[in-house]
Amino acid sequence: SPITTTVVVTPTFENGGNSNSGPTDTFIITVNPTAQIDPIENIVVCDEDIINPIVFTTENTGGVTIYSWTNDNTSISLASSGNGTIQGFTAINSSNTTQIATITVIPTFESGGVSNTGPSETFTITVNPTAQVDSLVDQVLCNGESTDAIEFTTTNTDGTTVFNWTNDNTTI
């Protein structure tokens, strides 16, 4: 919060060995704190998950802290910039790779008609792609024949995809 001090000025006039004091005057000096933002946790979600509003906070009191932010990857369905809280949104990843957006937040503290900008805080929003399996070819066999090897693959290029499968006819 701002720190203030009151300065009292008392004028004294001297001439010929005589002096007299005049009326005092006062003024206030206010020193605002450096704008600051509390750390923000990184976020990891999957395609089409809802991200709750991201509310920025500060330890500063006695004034107003305004936050401006930028986003370097709008493909996740978040605007390239804004002010204040990042409103909740549905994260989108329409690719087959993880999408990472770096969000940079800059705080500005205002009090007494004076503002100052503090150091930025950066966090990431990671949106993983939807799990996907490449198309499989149906197999037609005669009784007693073995199937060709069935390999499950994906076009997702990072992370790990685990394939679980079931068979609705266990007599085969």
Show which residues each predicted segment covers.
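Extracellular low-complexity Ser/Thr/Asn/Gly-rich intrinsically disordered segments
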Residues: 1-172
